[in-house]
């Protein structure tokens, strides 16, 4: 067997194989012999079918088995010989399998690009300046107040208004045919929240518990699901409950419900501290993102489409999980899988580029993650979650993928820290970013 490698691009290689005629013929004989033992043709006992009939009736099976066997025998050896580490499954193109003739086939795979990262020191980035502000604290207090609110049934005979809640069953249809993602049961909706298609919530203002109503809407032309965009839809809605929200007073008694506080002022002080921590983390994430974008701007690289697709699939899965927790779906957000991937493809590609470039910097600068780094992170995680350190450590020791992801995250953090230490960072107000 001989194999040669052709670079089709910085991330794609084509391996061409030629298997000698003698080896091909021997494999054909072996495979036909195996098929003959189990071949079933009317008029012959199993295993007693004449060879000529086996070859006549099982030609395609033979070719498939021979190709698979010769592929397994040659492909992985060639990867090792040529030091190729694919990130994708191979795309196979093959000649017809014939006795007495050499077999030529090719395997095209995607690989990691070879990156000579440059201009990663002295990156110029802006960092938002933290400014203390009471408004976010007041907003958080109102959120907590909303969270402690009670939903009580509307007075009998009273109609639901904007700001009230309704619990509904609904089934949506276009031209009388129900569509995917257009139905739910016992869905709680705040009227006026804008969570549904324009016009849907407005038509439920004035309903009463027990009422049935037909809601007519038209999906926006720019709606993410192309099958529904611009189409008129009808929703059969049953109102199971109508509720009004009652908010508690903001006072010391309210603060005491959150455990460690005796006064409202103590609660406000704690919220201010938490807000500062959150803003510091947000600003850090933002400047890290800017560092990565600057790094990408200085290093034009090609990335394997396979890695972009994997990143997109992970983003899609995460989005679906978040929506499911809110009893929502992509369709309710005006998207489907394809429109989501189209919308976020550039973002996914940038994330892949960033990861590969950060890894290249780590390799060039000898930045690594050691056991003390991992232990320190696990201790911080255990403390934050209020869990026993040994229990957290055991979990990661027993879950290889989880630990691998943790180490990768720590490595990126180290590299980003290095880049920031060597960057030209200018602090500016938020509106100057």
UniProtKB/Swiss-Prot annotation:
<dbReference type="InterPro" id="IPR008881">
    <property type="entry name" value="Trigger_fac_ribosome-bd_bac"/>
</dbReference>
<keyword id="KW-0132">Cell division</keyword>
<dbReference type="GO" id="GO:0005737">
    <property type="term" value="C:cytoplasm"/>
</dbReference>
<dbReference type="InterPro" id="IPR008880">
    <property type="entry name" value="Trigger_fac_C"/>
</dbReference>
<dbReference type="Pfam" id="PF05698">
    <property type="entry name" value="Trigger_C"/>
</dbReference>
<feature type="domain" description="PPIase FKBP-type">
    <location>
        <begin position="163"/>
        <end position="248"/>
    </location>
</feature>
<comment type="function">
    <text>Involved in protein export. Acts as a chaperone by maintaining the newly synthesized protein in an open conformation. Functions as a peptidyl-prolyl cis-trans isomerase.</text>
</comment>
<dbReference type="GO" id="GO:0003755">
    <property type="term" value="F:peptidyl-prolyl cis-trans isomerase activity"/>
</dbReference>
<keyword id="KW-0143">Chaperone</keyword>
<dbReference type="GO" id="GO:0051083">
    <property type="term" value="P:'de novo' cotranslational protein folding"/>
</dbReference>
<protein>
    <recommendedName>
        <fullName>Trigger factor</fullName>
        <ecNumber>5.2.1.8</ecNumber>
    </recommendedName>
</protein>
<dbReference type="GO" id="GO:0051301">
    <property type="term" value="P:cell division"/>
</dbReference>
<comment type="similarity">
    <text>Belongs to the FKBP-type PPIase family. Tig subfamily.</text>
</comment>
<keyword id="KW-0963">Cytoplasm</keyword>
<dbReference type="GO" id="GO:0015031">
    <property type="term" value="P:protein transport"/>
</dbReference>
<dbReference type="InterPro" id="IPR036611">
    <property type="entry name" value="Trigger_fac_ribosome-bd_sf"/>
</dbReference>
<dbReference type="Pfam" id="PF05697">
    <property type="entry name" value="Trigger_N"/>
</dbReference>
<keyword id="KW-0697">Rotamase</keyword>
<dbReference type="InterPro" id="IPR046357">
    <property type="entry name" value="PPIase_dom_sf"/>
</dbReference>
<dbReference type="Pfam" id="PF00254">
    <property type="entry name" value="FKBP_C"/>
</dbReference>
<dbReference type="InterPro" id="IPR005215">
    <property type="entry name" value="Trig_fac"/>
</dbReference>
<dbReference type="InterPro" id="IPR001179">
    <property type="entry name" value="PPIase_FKBP_dom"/>
</dbReference>
<keyword id="KW-0131">Cell cycle</keyword>
<dbReference type="InterPro" id="IPR027304">
    <property type="entry name" value="Trigger_fact/SurA_dom_sf"/>
</dbReference>
<dbReference type="InterPro" id="IPR037041">
    <property type="entry name" value="Trigger_fac_C_sf"/>
</dbReference>
<dbReference type="GO" id="GO:0043022">
    <property type="term" value="F:ribosome binding"/>
</dbReference>
<dbReference type="GO" id="GO:0061077">
    <property type="term" value="P:chaperone-mediated protein folding"/>
</dbReference>
<dbReference type="GO" id="GO:0043335">
    <property type="term" value="P:protein unfolding"/>
</dbReference>
<dbReference type="GO" id="GO:0044183">
    <property type="term" value="F:protein folding chaperone"/>
</dbReference>
<keyword id="KW-0413">Isomerase</keyword>
């Amino acid at each position: 067997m001989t194999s040669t490698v052709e670079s089709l691009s910085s991330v794609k290689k084509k391996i061409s194989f030629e298997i000698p005629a003698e080896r091909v013929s021997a494999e054909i004989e072996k495979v036909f012999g195996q098929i003959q033992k189990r071949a079933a043709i009317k008029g012959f006992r199993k295993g007693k079918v004449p060879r000529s009939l086996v070859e006549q009736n099982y030609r395609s099976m033979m070719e498939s088995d021979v190709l698979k066997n010769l592929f397994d025998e040659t492909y992985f050896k060639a990867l090792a010989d040529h030091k190729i580490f694919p990130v994708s499954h191979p795309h196979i193109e093959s000649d017809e399998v014939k006795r007495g003739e050499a077999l030529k086939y090719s395997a095209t795979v995607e690989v990691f690009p070879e990156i000579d990262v440059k201009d990663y020191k002295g990156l110029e980035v802006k960092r938002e300046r933290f400014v203390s502000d009471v408004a976010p604290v007041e907003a958080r207090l109102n959120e907590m107040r909303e969270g402690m609110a009670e939903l009580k049934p509307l007075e009998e005979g009273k109609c639901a208004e904007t700001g009230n809640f309704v619990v509904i069953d609904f089934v949506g249809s276009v031209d009388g045919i129900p569509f995917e993602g257009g139905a739910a049961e016992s869905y709680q909706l705040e009227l006026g929240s804008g969570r549904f298609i324009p016009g849907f919530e407005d038509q439920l203002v004035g309903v009463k518990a027990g009422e049935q109503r037909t809601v007519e809407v038209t999906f926006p032309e720019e709606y993410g699901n192309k099958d529904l965009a611009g189409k008129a839809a009808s929703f059969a809605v049953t109102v199971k409950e109508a509720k009004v929200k009652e908010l508690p007073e903001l006072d010391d008694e309210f603060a005491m419900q959150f455990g460690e506080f005796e006064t409202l002022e103590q609660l406000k002080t704690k919220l201010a501290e938490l807000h500062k921590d959150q803003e510091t983390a947000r600003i850090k994430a933002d400047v890290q993102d800017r560092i990565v974008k600057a790094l990408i701007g200085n290093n034009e690289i090609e990335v394997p489409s396979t890695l972009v697709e994997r990143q997109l699939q992970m983003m899609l899965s995460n989005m679906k999980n978040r929506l499911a927790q809110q009893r929502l779906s992509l369709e309710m957000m005006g998207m489907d899988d394809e429109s989501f991937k189209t919308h976020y493809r550039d973002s996914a590609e940038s994330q892949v580029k960033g990861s590969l470039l950060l890894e290249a910097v780590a390799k060039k600068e000898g930045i690594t993650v050691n056991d003390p780094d991992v232990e320190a992170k696990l201790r911080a995680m255990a403390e934050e979650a209020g869990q026993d350190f040994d229990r957290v450590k055991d979990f990661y020791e027993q879950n290889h993928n989880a630990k691998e992801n943790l180490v990768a995250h720590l490595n990126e953090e180290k590299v980003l820290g290095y880049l920031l230490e060597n960057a030209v960072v200018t602090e500016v107000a938020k509106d100057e970013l």
